[in-house]
Amino acid sequence: PVQQPAALRELISIQPGRVVSMALSRSEHCQMTLLAFGDGESISEERYFGDTVYYVLEGDMPLRLEGHEVRLGAGDCLAVPAQTTHAIGGPWPSGLVWG
């Protein structure tokens, strides 16, 4: 959304059996992606060069962070430091902003 404000939940929809993504920003200074997870979908363990912030728009989102699980709900936000191994996704449909 560049010209006018937009409700993030209306930009992307949860689809069964898929992880759907939409880039909101991909500049060298800021990368932000909107993600929608179908039931049981996830993104495997990763390490990113910069800090990563997750904000859950809807549903519940388990985040596995260096061996332990944190459950984020709608409205929750969590920052993961750079080079920290983590994975996101779980058995429920959910949507989040990642950047």
Regions found by a protein language model. Name each.
Residues 36-38, 47-63:
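Short, conserved beta-strand element in jelly-roll/cupin
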